[in-house]
């Protein structure tokens, strides 16, 4: 869609990332519009993101390109494409060059607890694989499929943020 827009516009175009640093990345037009509704006039709707994960960021400004942020495209895929063994994340550079390297980036507003076997009363559970039916929650993937879980991750984190706000869980 973006390529078609650029071709039909017949003028140069520049656009920053729509992601606000420190906030969740959006993978659906609805979530994006809700986040930006007071600061944009329109939204080009191409549907939900196919992959759901952040992009892989590669630093090619250095002598030996390296991965700054892991995403859906793997180190092996990039190395095969370039016919060069690209350095893994943080091996060559310690200086932060990409927002995805920050300790807190694309974070939900809701309080998250990782690796919980059983949620506390009133918590909302996000599971990888089935969870007990008596527990309020969402399942990234019933079949433990990594691609399905990746596609659903950010959308479900947005849902959990909304549910947490509705329950009064975010100050």
Model feature map: region roles:
Residues 1-171:
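Active-site-adjacent structural elements in enzyme catalytic cores
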């Amino acid at each position: 869609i973006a390529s078609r827009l650029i071709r039909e516009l017949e003028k140069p175009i520049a656009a920053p990332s729509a992601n606000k640093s420190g906030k969740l990345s959006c993978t659906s037009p609805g979530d994006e519009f809700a986040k930006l509704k007071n600061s944009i006039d329109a939204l080009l709707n191409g549907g939900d993101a196919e992959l759901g994960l952040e992009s892989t960021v590669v630093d090619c400004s250095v002598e030996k390109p390296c991965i700054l942020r892991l995403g859906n495209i793997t180190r092996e895929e990039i190395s095969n494409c370039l016919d060069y063994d690209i350095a893994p994340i943080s091996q060559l550079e310690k200086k932060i060059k990409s927002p995805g390297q920050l300790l807190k980036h694309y974070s939900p507003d809701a309080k998250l607890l990782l690796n919980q076997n059983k949620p506390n009363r009133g918590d909302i559970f996000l599971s990888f694989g089935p969870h007990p039916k008596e527990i309020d929650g969402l399942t990234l993937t019933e079949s433990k499929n990594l691609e399905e879980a990746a596609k659903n991750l950010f959308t479900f984190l947005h849902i959990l943020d909304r549910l947490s706000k509705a329950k009064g869980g975010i100050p």
